[in-house]
Amino acid sequence: MHVLLLNGPNLNLLGQREPGIYGCDTLATIETELTREAKADGVELVCFQSNFEGALIERIHQAMGESQGILINAGAYTHSSIAIRDALTGVAIPYVELHLSNTHAREPFRHQSYLAGRAVGVVSGFGAKSYSLALSGLVHHLRQGG
């Protein structure tokens, strides 16, 4: 099973940017740990991060025929990108939206997600553990025939 992990804008700054909200783990640390967890579960995880909407969309398109599932932390694009939603809808690959922080406990503009309505599920608010929980949920969904 092949799963694509997508991380959006500013997530390359994890560990430095607002640690009180996002925690102290770097993106590299999160990706390394999640890759280890995935491998132990028989899943090949490919990680991609970009601060650019078009690059994320291109990577979603490339996942067609290669990935059975997508994990996506679109960062601020969650609340603004119809284009990313359309790309995810267009490739028809099951995906889980995830966030480090509980977006519903933050500013009102973060309460809306353009991605959640088409997602298999949403995980938020558990810090770096959100990635592991999202992977577990997606793999379970895919193995159940989703």
Curated annotation (Swiss-Prot):
Quaternary structure and interacting proteins, as annotated: Homododecamer.
Active site (UniProt): 22, 99
Recorded metabolic or biological pathway in which this protein acts: Metabolic intermediate biosynthesis; chorismate biosynthesis; chorismate from D-erythrose 4-phosphate and phosphoenolpyruvate: step 3/7
Residues annotated to bind substrate: 73, 79, 86, 100-101, 110
Record has Lyase as a keyword: yes
Biological process (GO), any one: aromatic amino acid family biosynthetic process
General function of this protein: Catalyzes a trans-dehydration via an enolate intermediate.
Protein name: 3-dehydroquinate dehydratase
Recorded family membership: Belongs to the type-II 3-dehydroquinase family.
Residues at the site labelled Transition state stabilizer: 17
Gene Ontology MF terms: 3-dehydroquinate dehydratase activity
